[in-house]
């Protein structure tokens, strides 16, 4: 290869790298709203939910004003948290998470399912001190209903919401740990077939187990959309437990009568990369009647 051709190749590579870095910075500081419609005969009246996951202390604008504005424009009946609103980091501030949730809780009912980062705060007080207790006190003070292997029934709408917190071994890297068929039942009990059952379950890898347990709708996160998504193909590249091209990376999945909406999350941690993979807020319309599903995107 001649010197002139080599210069051309180097220039092309440099331009590609600059473009990729620009896209990464752009995608790391924006989010889209994805809108889903789900119907079921057991739902008694329409309910609009916003689903937030994996914020990891990220701020969209001053005091998260862009995120708050987007949620206000949706005008939800409730907000469902699918875990990891904060990042488990020694001596980290709780301010970003608590400030956002305080502003939201003043307007909307919030049901909060833990992710592995909230769980980690409780497991390792030697590393995180009293962060778990302070966070719990803050959420109780502003009236957030935390669902830690518990459930709440919305009688008027015919909906039952469960929040699961599974053992840390199910978050191990480099593989998926087998889960006993009775494990979820031992944590959560048995769901009622008369209610439309929503399960907030941070880790999507166990979707088949959630379906077997009896969930009608699973709300998950954790994977961050695979961090980098392959253009055109749209597949996420790597999961937090270091598996390439994870099966469950983001979007809607169906298994039998069970659907899972897997949020691509809003923030980042450890490896702060989002490429072709902006943050995501889910807008979910739960409607009475027959089967219907759909989705749309709106950038923010």
Where in this protein do the model-derived segments appear?
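Beta-strand-turn-beta hairpins that frame and shape the catalytic cleft
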Residues: 39-50, 144, 151-161, 192-193, ...
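Conserved beta-sheet core of the metallophosphoesterase superfamily
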Residues: 203-282, 290
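N-terminal membrane-anchoring alpha-helices
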Residues: 1-43
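Membrane-embedded segments
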Residues: 45, 50-145
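Active-site neighborhood of phospho(di)ester-bond hydrolases with catalytic His/Asp-centered motifs
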Residues: 51-53, 79-84, 109-116, 147-150, ...
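Solvent-exposed loop/turn segments at secondary-structure junctions
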Residues: 57, 85-88, 116-120, 167-169, ...
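Binuclear metal-dependent hydrolase catalytic cores centered on His/Asp/Glu-rich metal-binding motifs
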Residues: 122-142, 151, 156-197, 207-208, ...
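Active-site-proximal beta-strand elements of phosphoester/diester hydrolases
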Residues: 46-56, 158-168, 198-201, 259-264
């Amino acid at each position: 290869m001649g010197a002139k051709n080599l210069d051309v190749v180097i220039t092309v590579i440099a331009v590609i790298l600059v473009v990729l870095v620009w896209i990464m910075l752009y995608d790391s500081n924006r989010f889209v709203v994805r809108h889903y419609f789900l119907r079921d005969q057991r739902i008694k009246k329409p309910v609009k939910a916003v689903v937030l996951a994996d914020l990891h202390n990220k701020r969209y604008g001053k005091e998260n004003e862009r995120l708050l504005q987007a949620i206000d424009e949706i005008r939800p009946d409730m907000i469902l948290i699918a875990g990891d609103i904060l990042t488990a980091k020694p001596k980290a501030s709780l301010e970003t998470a608590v400030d956002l949730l305080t502003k939201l809780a003043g307007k909307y009912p919030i049901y909060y399912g833990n992710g592995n980062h909230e769980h980690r705060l409780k497991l390792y007080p030697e590393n995180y001190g009293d962060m778990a207790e302070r966070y719990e006190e803050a959420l109780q003070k502003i009236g957030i209903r935390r669902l830690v292997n518990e459930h709440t029934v919305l009688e008027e709408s015919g909906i039952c919401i469960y929040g699961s917190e599974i053992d840390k071994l199910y978050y191990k890297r480099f593989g998926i740990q087998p889960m006993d068929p009775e494990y979820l039942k031992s944590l959560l009990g048995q769901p009622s077939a008369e209610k439309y059952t929503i399960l907030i379950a941070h880790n999507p890898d166990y979707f088949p187990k959630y379906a077997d347990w009896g969930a009608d709708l699973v709300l998950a996160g954790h994977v961050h959309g695979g961090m980098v998504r392959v253009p055109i193909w749209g597949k996420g590249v790597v999961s937090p437990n270091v598996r390439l091209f994870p099966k469950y990376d983001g979007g809607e999945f169906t298994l039998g009568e069970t659907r899972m909406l897997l949020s691509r999350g809003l923030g980042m941690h450890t490896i702060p990369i989002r490429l072709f993979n902006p943050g995501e807020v889910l807008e979910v319309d739960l409607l009475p009647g027959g089967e219907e599903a759909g989705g749309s995107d709106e950038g923010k």
